[in-house]
Amino acid sequence: MSETQRAFVKRITHETQVQIALALNGGPLEIGQSILGGAKTTVAHQASSSQVINVQTGVGFLDHMIHALAKHSGWSLIVECVGDLHIDDHHTTEDCGLALGQALREAIGQVRGVKRFGTGFAPLDEALSRAVVDLSNRPYAVVDLGLRREKIGDLSTEMIPHFLQSFAESARVTLHVDCLRGTNDHHRSESAFKAVAVALRDALTRTGTDDVPSTKGVLM
């Protein structure tokens, strides 16, 4: 694990500007200079002595999902994005996933002294999702949420698994997520993100040793 277990990532392309601050153990967190100007909201926002979360991507349902991921992972997290939403939600969603994955990878550093493998189940009313993660340095994602609607709020449902795939690719983790049951696509999606959070928290549980959990002797 990295010494600080914190990361700051800035990703700037011709399509989006994203900056992310992440603290795996929660606590106070801030970004020095916002890229949002005056266009700020407080919907996906909370602040306490143990956790600071502020997610502003310009896509409301994406904010909601990332907020749930951070909350149940125990992270403090600030996400700011200014993207080409006049085109569609693809670049914003993908780049936020890539930047968040990079931040997680940098905050973890070398994988040692942790379980490495994590499993999470999370219900939301009638929906139940399962996530399994391996901090493996082998980026791969299998995501099956069975979503039926074209959009949830202003987020295309096809971008929900794509966010998780982009996140896993950039974090260099293996991630399997599936929704086992559920009739409401909002519930299916949210239970999936919460399950991922539980799995990540499990994978990062300290073992009480400084060992690398691999026969290779190194991970990440």
From Swiss-Prot:
It catalyses: D-erythro-1-(imidazol-4-yl)glycerol 3-phosphate = 3-(imidazol-4-yl)-2-oxopropyl phosphate + H2O. One of its GO terms (biological process) is L-histidine biosynthetic process. GO terms for molecular function: imidazoleglycerol-phosphate dehydratase activity. Pfam families: IGPD (PF00475). Its EC number is 4.2.1.19. PANTHER family: IMIDAZOLEGLYCEROL-PHOSPHATE DEHYDRATASE (PTHR23133:SF2), IMIDAZOLEGLYCEROL-PHOSPHATE DEHYDRATASE HIS7 (PTHR23133). Belongs to the imidazoleglycerol-phosphate dehydratase family. This is Imidazoleglycerol-phosphate dehydratase. It comes from Eremothecium gossypii (strain ATCC 10895 / CBS 109.51 / FGSC 9923 / NRRL Y-1056) (Yeast). The lineage of its organism: Eukaryota, Fungi, Dikarya, Ascomycota, Saccharomycotina.
